[in-house]
Amino acid sequence: MASAGGGDCEGAGPEADRPHQRPFLIGVSGGTASGKSTVCEKIMELLGQNEVDHRQRKLVILSQDRFYKVLTAEQKAKALKGQYNFDHPDAFDNDLMHRTLKNIVEGKTVEVPTYDFVTHSRLAETTVVYPADVVLFEGILVFYSQEIRDMFHLRLFVDTDSDVRLSRRVLRDVQRGRDLEQILTQYTTFVKPAFEEFCLPTKKYADVIIPRGVDNMVAINLIVQHIQDILNGDICKWHRAGANGRSHKRTFPEPGEHPAVLASGKRSHLESSSRPH
């Protein structure tokens, strides 16, 4: 068992060292290799989080990838050949995911599984995630299940060009020891169709859509400001807005596009109006 202090799980410190609390839960979705984890890491960096002194952390990052189901021998054989669909909703242990998130929202310390992408198996080792003020939960299908989707106080969707996502996916899977031909076959057979059928339709549930992911620093900075408001005790305004039926939904435009219309009806210039050559 390991305490959260690196990788995609960042802990906030032992419960004995901090008061019991109910975290503000943020869902971060988007297609494969869209930059979800990078966006989360940038948010953590801008909030001044430190990988060494994890006891002082107020923000946790948790990946949906940790909740892949334990495969049968037949399924594992298919996975090793690139013939198993890891982008389908049924590939995830949604019951365990829901229970874990429920405990996190209740301010409890939880143990999350560790998944090995080389052997396609869940390891015996778990990671301890301590209570935090803000929890970022990222994954391709975190908005697919209504039961899980409704748990988020804020929903972000990272919207990245499909060609960019494919190139990132290839590089990532090659680094995981995968064969290039197998990667491309899996992408065209499973990944792309699953994105169009299961992931992309959930974009409509996002409160904030972030074009170009971490490259869109205007969007990232505004989101960080909202999180800072929460950390500073201004979380109530979000709950009040939700109770009054007001939507937080907004899309951060590309350079050269018209500025987004905010919930208040006012227009706000979020990026430069000139597109770089």
From Swiss-Prot:
InterPro entries (alphabetical): P-loop_NTPase, PRK/URK, Uridine_kinase-like
E.C. numbers: 2.7.1.48
GO term, biological process aspect, one: UMP salvage
Modification sites for Phosphothreonine: 251
Pfam families: PRK
GO molecular function: ATP binding; cytidine kinase activity; uridine kinase activity
Residues binding ATP, per UniProt: 30-38, 215
Disordered: annotated segments: 1-29, 246-277
Keywords: ATP-binding, Kinase, Nucleotide-binding, Phosphoprotein, Transferase
CC terms in the record's Gene Ontology section: cytoplasm
Compositionally biased tracts (Gly residues): 1-10
Catalysed conversion reaction: uridine + ATP = UMP + ADP + H(+); cytidine + ATP = CMP + ADP + H(+)
Basic and acidic residues: bias regions: 268-277
Top-level division of the source organism's lineage: Eukaryota
Binding site for substrate: 87, 115, 120, 169, 178, 186
Segment forming the signal sequence: none
Function: Phosphorylates uridine and cytidine to uridine monophosphate and cytidine monophosphate. Does not phosphorylate deoxyribonucleosides or purine ribonucleosides. Can use ATP or GTP as a phosphate donor.
NCBIfam families: PRK05480.1, udk
Family: Belongs to the uridine kinase family.
Name under which the protein is recorded: Uridine-cytidine kinase 1
Organism whose genome encodes this protein: Bos taurus
Organism phylogeny: Eukaryota, Metazoa, Chordata, Craniata, Vertebrata
